[in-house]
Amino acid sequence: MTISELLQYCMAKPGAEQSVHNDWKATQIKVEDVLFAMVKEVENRPAVSLKTSPELAELLRQQHSDVRPSRHLNKAHWSTVYLDGSLPDSQIYYLVDASYQQAVNLLPEEKRKLLVQL
């Protein structure tokens, strides 16, 4: 999977907004100012940081060498996934969906209702 393909998938989510975090040289994808994906190159490899439950994060890290704790985010919840690694694209898409849903669940009910209408 390429960074471009991943960004296209993320931006298709209702309410998704893209911005650049210059200090980290990363593209942040948010829904209503809640981060759900951060895309950048790590060690010259395309990667995305995604939020999961601590249990899933630990399991993924144990099973896949291409999944690591995120450097600049809460390591219990955020994992960096290399896009050119062993994790299948379908699983990366699933993790994006889960991270997006966690972000949406943090929003006030009124904002969640508006997203459904988009």
From Swiss-Prot:
InterPro entries: YjbR, YjbR-like_sf. SUPFAM superfamilies: YjbR-like. It comes from the Bacteria. Disulfide bonds: none annotated. This is Uncharacterized protein YjbR.
